[in-house]
A protein has these predicted regions:
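Beta-rich strand-turn-strand
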Residues: 84-89, 98-105
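Acidic, metal-coordinating catalytic segment for phosphate/diphosphate chemistry
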Residues: 12-50, 55-56
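A short coil-to-beta-strand element that immediately follows conserved catalytic motifs
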Residues: 9-10, 102-109
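Active-site-adjacent beta-strand/loop module that shapes the phosphate/pyrophosphate-binding cleft
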Residues: 26-33, 115-135
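A short, amphipathic edge element
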Residues: 2-15
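Recognition helices and adjacent regulatory flanks at domain boundaries
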Residues: 65, 94-97, 101, 124
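Short, solvent-exposed loop/turn elements at beta->coil junctions and helix N-caps
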Residues: 13-15, 110-115
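Conserved Nudix-box catalytic region and its N-terminal flanking loop in Nudix hydrolases
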Residues: 2-5, 42-93, 110, 134-135
C-alpha cells in the first residue's frame, strides 16, 4: 500500500530561484521509510484572477499568443493580483485592460489551484455582468 504523505514528511525546504512574480522551491519528501526524494514546486505569493464576462448571453473571450506553449489561444481575461490589491479589483482591472469593457456587477465563482501538482498558485474566478464599453487604453 502506498504511503499517504503529510506535511510531517516534508523536510529542508529551500528557495532555489526567485523572480518578482514567483519562486522555485525544493523540499525533501519522505516517500517511504528511509527513502527521501527531492520535490520541486513553484510558489506564488499572490493569487491570479480570471473573469468570465457575460453580455447578452455571450461570453467575452480574448485571443492571444502564449509563448510558453507557442500557440494562439482563446481565454477569459486574467492576470496577477498586484501587491495590496483586492482580487475583485484586480479582476475588473484585467477585464478593462484586456478588452475595453467594464462590469457593473462582479461576483466570485470559485477559488482553485489549477496546477496543484507543481505549484501552489491560487486562481480566483469571477463572474462579470452588466458590461459597458469604455474603450481600450492607449498603452
Amino acid at each position: 500500500m502506498k504511503k499517504k504523505l503529510t506535511a510531517a514528511d516534508m523536510h529542508d525546504p529551500q528557495v532555489i530561484a526567485e523572480t518578482p512574480w514567483f519562486s522555485m522551491r525544493k523540499v525533501g519528501i519522505d516517500v517511504a521509510p528511509g527513502e527521501r526524494r527531492d520535490f520541486y514546486a513553484i510558489h506564488y505569493p499572490r493569487p491570479a484572477v480570471g473573469i468570465v464576462a457575460i453580455q447578452d448571453e455571450k461570453v467575452l473571450l480574448i485571443r492571444h499568443y502564449r509563448y510558453l506553449i507557442d500557440k494562439v489561444v482563446w481565454a477569459i481575461p486574467s492576470g496577477g493580483v498586484d501587491e495590496e490589491e483586492d482580487p475583485a479589483v484586480a479582476a475588473l482591472r484585467e477585464l478593462r485592460e484586456e478588452t475595453g469593457w467594464q462590469a457593473q456587477r462582479v461576483e466570485e465563482i470559485i477559488r482553485f489551484n489549477p496546477s496543484y501538482g507543481s505549484s501552489d498558485q491560487l486562481f480566483i474566478t469571477w463572474l462579470a455582468t452588466d458590461l459597458r464599453w469604455v474603450g481600450m487604453d492607449a498603452d
